[in-house]
Amino acid sequence: MNDTFMKTRPVFPLLLSMALPNVISMLVNSLYNIVDSLFVARISEQAMTALSLVYPIQNFVNAVAIGFGVGINVQIALYLGAGDREQANRSATHGMAFSLLHGVLAMILCPAIMPGFLARFTDDSTLVSMGVTYSTIVFLFTLVNMADLAFEKIFQAVGRMNVSMVALVAGCVSNIMLDPILIFGLGPVPALGIAGAALATGIGQAVTLCVYLYVYCTTELPVRLSFPQLRPDAALDGKLYAIGIPAILNLALPSLLVTFLNSLLAAFSQSYVTVLGIYYKLQTFLYLPANGIVQGMRPLVGYNYGAKEHGRVAKLYNLTLGLSAGIMAIGTLLCLTVSGPLMSLFTSNPETIAIGRTALRIICLGFIVSAVSTTSSGALEGLGKGMSSLVISLCRYVIFIMPIAWLLCGRMGPTGVWHAFWITEVLSAAIAYGVYCPAQCAQSNP
């Protein structure tokens, strides 16, 4: 199968062809997350709060899977661009093996730490029990989830975005169909409550993996997994982790941030914790088109950088930035005009809706400028500069927002936390542009 189209097709249609399947698959995944939350919210607001408290650890596990997958993705794309298929095959094989190892470790460790973790944020035994029930079942499927995301990045690296789209859609549709049956019961199937939501999630992930395995076994691809390729290769493994670890941290930092913000907001009311959890559900949906474009850009940047097509790398960055900013402008408009209805999808509590309406209208002020940070971070990962990408994420999720949120919370109460979001995005955008420009100049003039 020929992969040279990634350096020969015109940039704009190429980026769209790579991004659109990502956007569709992420849209379906986000719709699943929202539908899943809607079903859980029908159990009780306590159930919704339990999911909000579990979110940081669940997000961290996904960060490990996706972040290391970025390392796999970039290395495969770089080697294919340079015409080295043997190293591309070895990258895919080693990447899958390490992903499965990560899954086994997470499957053992995460259930063990959850009771203590949840007890740090609430003394409500019902909330802790719900959170433990949900997380224990979800983490039993971690090995499957790790394999899913490794395959996703492998297919994306070779330009087969449509396969990832079909696999994810199949899993999400299965999940959505199973949610009401397993949560509320149907016929001989008993009502499992929050445990049913977790089980539906795991089954959906298994369906996705089945699709990937079927396509992999029946389709010719530029890269193949091969057991003999698993012989020790410290240099290659080091490259996978050199990109993967910063990418993992990039994605895990929001979990650290949510944990920190939960500790600030819980001092006022559990309603604020619930609002923060709902915001992150909505944020996933609002950011997904821009994130889909960045995901489509990343392997193209890696491939063209490997092929020394530096002018195309610059065009890809500028085009992605413009498209992302336009999309985030639409997200800003939605949050300013229909924040109340958006919140009412997840709760009927008037106090929670009022708090959420204010939060969305303040936080969204930083959406447009955040396009600079997300685009720069994705482009740097594509260039193999994981540490530079990590600097941007540290600014967004630790260095700026944590002290700003703490200071403003002390002066303005919970509203100060919401203001910290947009202030941080403005400051981080300036840093991101300052980090990316020298990197782009360096790779254009080696």
Task: Name what the model sees in each region.
Residues 17-36, 137, 171, 204-208, ...:
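Transmembrane helical elements of multi-pass membrane transporters/channels
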Residues 8, 12-31, 35, 57-64, ...:
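Residue-level signal for short hydrophobic patches within transmembrane helices
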Residues 69, 73, 138-156, 164-172, ...:
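Short runs within selected transmembrane alpha-helices of multi-pass transporters and secretion channels
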Residues 60-63, 107, 175-180, 209-213, ...:
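Hydrophobic transmembrane alpha-helices of multi-pass small-molecule transporters
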Residues 27, 31-49, 118-125, 181-192, ...:
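Helix-terminus/linker motif at the lipid-water interface of multi-pass membrane proteins
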Residues 48-108, 145-159, 163-164, 262, ...:
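Small-residue-rich hydrophobic transmembrane alpha-helices
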Residues 39-59, 125-130, 194-196, 236-243, ...:
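Interfacial/gating helices of multi-pass transporter permease domains
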Residues 1-19, 76-143, 189-245, 301-366, ...:
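Short alpha-helical transmembrane segments in multi-pass integral membrane proteins
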